[in-house]
């Protein structure tokens, strides 16, 4: 007969349960009620200047997020620069890239007792790159070269995006502690707001932002010119090179809690067996910032460059135009498909052609691949850069909204932050025969279905209608051109049927 469990152990379990319940307690809510702050604190990159980061819940999407608080001691100085602070966060809210931790929302909380900015960011639960590398080394495993290339490509994709903004966004705090890796291999860069906070805040508000370098153990991630007036995007390239070196060797040994020495970095460089990888990393770590390549050029280095497969190109094309297709298009197409039919064939000089049939395609693997491409794990790099994001972008609220901004907990602006993944519309004559009745269905990326109806004249512009939907917060700014083209095509087809 088993002995009864000791009472102290049961007591410890009850204590752990109580602690877990305490951590899930809701301490505070956002003004709109969507974000709920919990007691549990999280570490998402040791962001200097952020006094507290808590786990929070997004009650609309049912996912965990991070609740960040930036505190200001001088209440009067904060009030004097409130507009500049809002503009700074509006700029950050525009930064949208699959390999960058997303800033979802922000608001100001200014009372007689305190002044703070609260902003909600994406939560990456799988941990930092440094934690992953330590775990890999502890398990006596070597770094897979293919994984190294994939991670470098994703990090450079994010840096190329930031540096292509106008003006360029310099990360300024890129280390293996501020790079996160998800369970599916997706890389996310955090603390993008570090440099903007350090440089954009006025001198009298600079006190909560520690502009000095990170703790000693991370000093080796920063180049010699770091902190100088004229430093630029090359700062991030040096930091990336050190991250790439650490990923390749798993760990650069430090002397206890002190900084990593030049000798340790040299030993790590010499341990690289691949000459292309060594040359790639050394070009990033050049002492002269003018000799470091740009993030975009590094993507074309021979150690990373590869010709994209037709499968990957087709996947990106499919995802970019998925908004034109029904939600269950893949399922419907495969139902009507003859699985024994030939999908493709390759002629052989001697003998019959090599054939692939639909039955050889794993639709489950195909769905997973499409999801990975959609999430940003396989970016397209061998093409011209997309139109750069223009910053700063001044969002002028209506007068009544500007008045609200002076209240303790304002909502800065109401704009749609979710992208459209599917569009459908129907046109028919209205009862008076002079107008068209438009029914528009928009499926957003969180699967929200938004159905809109509108009576319009045949002479109305698709561009004006799309702009109006953006203005009233029904459509993301990035989807305006896409929707306008979709509506224009629909209008032309409908006019043809009425002729």
Curated annotation (Swiss-Prot):
What Gene Ontology terms describe what this protein does at the molecular function level? ATP binding; protein kinase activity
Biased-composition ranges for Acidic residues? 18-28
> Which tissues is this protein detected in according to the database?
Expressed in Purkinje cells of the cerebellum and neurons in the CA3 region of the hippocampus. Also detected in non-neural tissues including mesenchymal layer adjacent to epithelium in developing bronchi of the lung, the epithelium of the stomach as well as cells in the liver.
**Which residues does this entry mark as bearing Phosphothreonine?**
407, 409
Superkingdom of the organism of origin: Eukaryota
Q: Where does the record place the Protein kinase domain?
A: 36-304
Q: Pfam families in the record, alphabetically? A: Pkinase
Where in or outside the cell?
Cytoplasm
Which Gene Ontology cellular-component terms appear in the entry? Answer: cytoplasm
InterPro entries xref list: Kinase-like_dom_sf, NRBP2_PK, Prot_kinase_dom, WNK_Ser-Thr_kinase
Chain intervals for the UniProt region annotation (Disordered): 1-31, 396-416
Q: Which keywords does this chain's UniProt record carry?
A: Cytoplasm, Neurogenesis, Phosphoprotein
- What's an example GO BP annotation here? neuron differentiation
Comp. bias regions, Basic and acidic residues: 7-17
Task: Return the PROSITE patterns for the record.
Answer: PROTEIN_KINASE_DOM (PS50011)
The written remark on domains in the entry is: The protein kinase domain is predicted to be catalytically inactive.
Q: What does this protein do?
A: May regulate apoptosis of neural progenitor cells during their differentiation.
Membership in a protein family: Belongs to the protein kinase superfamily. Ser/Thr protein kinase family.
Its name, as the record gives it, is Nuclear receptor-binding protein 2
Identify the species of origin: Mus musculus (Mouse)
The organism that produces this protein has a lineage beginning with: Eukaryota, Metazoa, Chordata, Craniata, Vertebrata
């Amino acid at each position: 007969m088993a002995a009864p469990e000791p009472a102290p152990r049961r007591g410890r379990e009850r204590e752990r349960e109580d602690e877990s319940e305490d951590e899930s307690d809701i301490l505070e809510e956002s003004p709109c009620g969507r974000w709920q702050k919990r007691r549990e604190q999280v570490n998402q990159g040791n962001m200097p200047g952020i006094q507290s980061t808590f786990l929070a819940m997004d009650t609309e999407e049912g996912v965990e997020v991070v609740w960040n608080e930036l505190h200001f001691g001088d209440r009067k100085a904060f009030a004097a620069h409130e507009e500049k602070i809002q503009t700074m966060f509006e700029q950050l809210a525009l930064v949208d890239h699959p390999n960058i931790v997303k800033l979802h929302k922000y608001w100001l909380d200014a009372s007689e007792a305190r002044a703070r900015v609260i902003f909600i960011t994406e939560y990456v639960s799988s941990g930092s790159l440094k934690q992953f590398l330590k775990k890999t080394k502890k398990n006596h495993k070597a770094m897979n070269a293919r994984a190294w290339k994939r991670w470098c490509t994703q990090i450079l994709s994010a840096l190329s995006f930031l540096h292509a903004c106008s003006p360029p966004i310099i990360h300024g705090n890129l280390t293996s502690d501020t790079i996160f890796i998800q369970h599916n291999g997706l890389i996310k860069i955090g603390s993008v707001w570090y440099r903007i906070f350090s440089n954009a805040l006025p001198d009298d508000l600079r006190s909560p932002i520690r502009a000095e370098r990170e703790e000693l153990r991370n000093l080796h991630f920063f180049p010699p010119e770091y902190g100088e007036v004229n430093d630029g995007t090359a700062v991030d390239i040096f930091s990336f090179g050190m991250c790439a070196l650490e990923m390749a060797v798993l760990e650069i040994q430090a002397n206890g809690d002190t900084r990593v020495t030049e000798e340790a970095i040299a030993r790590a460089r010499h341990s690289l067996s691949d000459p292309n990888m060594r040359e790639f990393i050394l070009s990033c770590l050049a002492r002269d910032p003018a000799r470091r390549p740009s993030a975009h050029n590094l993507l074309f280095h021979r150690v990373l460059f590869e010709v994209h497969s037709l499968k990957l190109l087709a996947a990106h094309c499919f995802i970019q135009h998925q908004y034109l297709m029904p939600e269950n298009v893949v399922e419907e197409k495969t139902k009507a498909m003859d699985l024994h039919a030939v999908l493709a064939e390759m002629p052989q000089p001697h003998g019959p052609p090599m054939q692939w049939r639909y039955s050889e395609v794993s639709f489950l693997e195909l769905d997973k691949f499409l999801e990975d491409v959609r999430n940003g794990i396989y970016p397209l790099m061998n093409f011209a850069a997309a139109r750069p994001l223009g910053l700063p972008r001044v969002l002028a609220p209506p007068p009544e909204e500007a008045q609200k901004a002076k209240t303790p907990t304002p909502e800065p602006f109401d704009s749609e932050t979710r992208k459209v993944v599917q569009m459908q519309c129907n046109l028919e004559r209205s009862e008076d025969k002079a107008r068209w009745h438009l029914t528009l269905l928009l499926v957003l990326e969180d699967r929200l279905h938004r159905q809109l109806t509108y009576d319009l004249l045949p002479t109305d512009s698709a561009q004006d209608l799309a702009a109006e939907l953006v203005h009233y917060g029904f459509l993301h700014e990035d989807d305006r051109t896409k929707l306008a083209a979709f509506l224009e095509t629909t209008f032309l087809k409908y006019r043809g049927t009425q002729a």
